[in-house]
Amino acid sequence: MSFKALVNRAVAGRRFRYYLSRLSAYPAFDPLFDIVANRLGPGLRHICELGFVPDLVIDVGAHAGHWTIAARRHFPKARFLMIEAQLEKEPSLRKVAQTAPGRIEYALALLGPEPRETVEFYLCDTGSSLYQEQTSFSRQATKMAMTTLDAVAGKAMAESGPILLKLDVQGAELDVLAGGTAVLDRAEVVILEASIVAYNAGAPRVAAVIAQLASLGFNLFDVIDLRRIQPVLAQLDLVFVRAGGRLEASAAAIIRHYGSD
């Protein structure tokens, strides 16, 4: 029996689940469970297993490009467009793009619902946003020009098939989507971060995000990360799929056959 088969057998066993549930009662194991809750890799793999292969992946809030690197392992034939507002991340994004010339591109732009000459933007490394964080991390307010997702992604999606759109913009996800109607028309999957608590001042929280995505024609499909700050569940990474699309059809087929084996 292979190592993978042994692991699968152990994990599926009742005894393993029993002892895992016992460990969850001990606070010392909380960091371990928080790590296990980060399921980006399995989440993307499940999308592939259900038959969805994007032609174009748009990574909004790319930061240094780490998400694109991780996602490309699951979608090696897709083209990637990384979009980041922080100008100082350009060397990192360029380095990632150079790993796959012609397959990975990047753009430096602050996205929002409409073009504006200047808006206030809060620089805070991974927490940079249109909405000021409620944390104690140091930040710097600056003025930047704003454009839209459709304007930046127009060339990349001109000849593309289905799109996977990822957004991690610290509370400004709905603002970006408001300026990305053409992208959404072609998207089958939207992955975004949403806050359970008031993490960014004035930013919509998870219930409002789910409701807005539903109004745009996307249903919640998976939860691939839970971010805790001590005992507080602060943020979730959510996967939405097009209502009535191929992924919902694949999921429905699995549910229909559940119990028939």
Each language-model region and where it sits:
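Phosphate/nucleotide-binding beta-alpha loop and adjacent structural elements of enzyme active sites
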Residues: 1-261
